[in-house]
Amino acid sequence: MTTDQLPAELERVHMVGIGGAGMSGIARILLDRGGLVSGSDAKESRGIHALRARGAQIRIGHDASSLDLLPGGPTAVITTHAAIPKTNPELVEARRRGIPVILRPAVLAKLMDGRTTLMVTGTHGKTTTTSMLIVALQHCGRDPSFAVGGEMGEAGTNAHHGSGDCFVAEADESDGSLLEYTPDVAVVTNIETDHLDFYGSADAYVAVFDAFVERLAPGGALVVCVDDPGAAALARRTAELGIRVLRYGSGSHGQAPSGQPLAATLVSWQQQGTEAVAQIRLAGEQQHPLVMRLSVPGRHMALNAMGALLAAIEIGAPTEAVLDGLAGFEGVRRRFELVGTAGGPAPSSTVRVFDDYAHHPTEIAATLAAVRTLLEQSGGGRSIAVFQPHLYSRTKAFAEEFGRALDAADEVFVLDVYGAREQPLAGVSGASVAEHVSVPVRYLPDFSAAAEQVAAAAAPGDVIVTMGAGDVTLLGPEIVTALRVRANRGAPGALR
């Protein structure tokens, strides 16, 4: 039975770092369910303006007095340990007053109580797969509540309190917080070593997925992509525990190449510009393969959609309605998002600029593969990759792998490391990645000069893609502007 009534401790909350993707989503749901919300963050943002419009009291900067923004003060203070230090003055003041400090994952778990819970995790593709599942269920009339790590194109938001009986959310594995949840359906897209700054070893990272699956509710199911070796191994271990496993991936006659049975098989896939058409077969279906159309390119997107399809079917959504919903999925901000174009109307006379959140070698490889197919279908041109490494620890661990992945581009620009929460490491910079790139590459430590240099390298028909989890997303519009300026003044290079 669902209820809109909030737990008493969440009726009046103060959120430290309220503008973050995950925190702002929690704030939206709390406000929609009648809660009072105050918060603070380091800087203004579009998300903060939207929360203020909904009634949240938000202060820029961190100060102990922010705990008095709500009449009577908060019943709890919510934070995220990944980005907010324990020395934050608002957290210090909360502890002094005896106000409970609750981490975001624990709050999300409380908000899910009483609903059928579907959670998506994995090293790559979490946000996109979660968003696909949400859109599919919305199309089926289920109106799910949801919390996702990116802004969905259709909804223009990252969270929603729905009237339906299910809750869809992204489960973040980066800090072990996915162990707060007890899902009815868990989707695992892939497992590949990451976040060694937190886990310390590959074995510890892999183990958290096993622990997550073991938290499935009685009668729950694991939906897992067995094209990925790490996820396929998880499927085998999970089946040995007696948990129901629904596998999806490439194969024939209902089996993956490994011999594992498939609940959904990717029979064929074809990219058509920035769209894709896949043929899939569901277990037990004897008729011709089903056609799955997507408005987002890349074989990896087809696999993500298959995971969403199986999860939706698992809770009773009609197959054809789910496929119709997936066909209307417009993507997520920063997932192969078209930023802009400069030049003529034909692909051969224009430069297209995309932005992508890719910040792991495998993600970069998938994004550049989609770019390559796009170029092949539009008559040629070059791919230009602009990559900003994220975190010093990740850059140190994967510098060589980043270089190999970037070799799929025709030309590469590497920016300096976006450190986020980390302090610099001696000898680690964007140059650490650039030295492992074998195609033409330039290391650009000066972010402010990057847009002009990238624009100068482009020619009609080229595709530029900015990649990374930091502020490289700001660069795309600057590149588009620089391209247009160069074209207007007849500068050599881009659009002569």
Swiss-Prot record:
<comment type="function">
    <text>Cell wall formation.</text>
</comment>
<feature type="binding site">
    <location>
        <begin position="122"/>
        <end position="128"/>
    </location>
    <ligand>
        <name>ATP</name>
    </ligand>
</feature>
<dbReference type="GO" id="GO:0071555">
    <property type="term" value="P:cell wall organization"/>
</dbReference>
<dbReference type="GO" id="GO:0005737">
    <property type="term" value="C:cytoplasm"/>
</dbReference>
<dbReference type="InterPro" id="IPR013221">
    <property type="entry name" value="Mur_ligase_cen"/>
</dbReference>
<dbReference type="GO" id="GO:0009252">
    <property type="term" value="P:peptidoglycan biosynthetic process"/>
</dbReference>
<dbReference type="InterPro" id="IPR050061">
    <property type="entry name" value="MurCDEF_pg_biosynth"/>
</dbReference>
<protein>
    <recommendedName>
        <fullName>UDP-N-acetylmuramate--L-alanine ligase</fullName>
        <ecNumber>6.3.2.8</ecNumber>
    </recommendedName>
</protein>
<dbReference type="Pfam" id="PF02875">
    <property type="entry name" value="Mur_ligase_C"/>
</dbReference>
<dbReference type="InterPro" id="IPR036615">
    <property type="entry name" value="Mur_ligase_C_dom_sf"/>
</dbReference>
<dbReference type="GO" id="GO:0005524">
    <property type="term" value="F:ATP binding"/>
</dbReference>
<dbReference type="InterPro" id="IPR036565">
    <property type="entry name" value="Mur-like_cat_sf"/>
</dbReference>
<keyword id="KW-0436">Ligase</keyword>
<keyword id="KW-0133">Cell shape</keyword>
<dbReference type="GO" id="GO:0008763">
    <property type="term" value="F:UDP-N-acetylmuramate-L-alanine ligase activity"/>
</dbReference>
<dbReference type="Pfam" id="PF08245">
    <property type="entry name" value="Mur_ligase_M"/>
</dbReference>
<comment type="pathway">
    <text>Cell wall biogenesis; peptidoglycan biosynthesis.</text>
</comment>
<keyword id="KW-0963">Cytoplasm</keyword>
<keyword id="KW-0132">Cell division</keyword>
<keyword id="KW-0067">ATP-binding</keyword>
<dbReference type="InterPro" id="IPR000713">
    <property type="entry name" value="Mur_ligase_N"/>
</dbReference>
<keyword id="KW-0131">Cell cycle</keyword>
<keyword id="KW-0547">Nucleotide-binding</keyword>
<dbReference type="InterPro" id="IPR005758">
    <property type="entry name" value="UDP-N-AcMur_Ala_ligase_MurC"/>
</dbReference>
<dbReference type="InterPro" id="IPR004101">
    <property type="entry name" value="Mur_ligase_C"/>
</dbReference>
<dbReference type="GO" id="GO:0008360">
    <property type="term" value="P:regulation of cell shape"/>
</dbReference>
<keyword id="KW-0573">Peptidoglycan synthesis</keyword>
<dbReference type="Pfam" id="PF01225">
    <property type="entry name" value="Mur_ligase"/>
</dbReference>
<comment type="similarity">
    <text>Belongs to the MurCDEF family.</text>
</comment>
<keyword id="KW-0961">Cell wall biogenesis/degradation</keyword>
<dbReference type="GO" id="GO:0051301">
    <property type="term" value="P:cell division"/>
</dbReference>
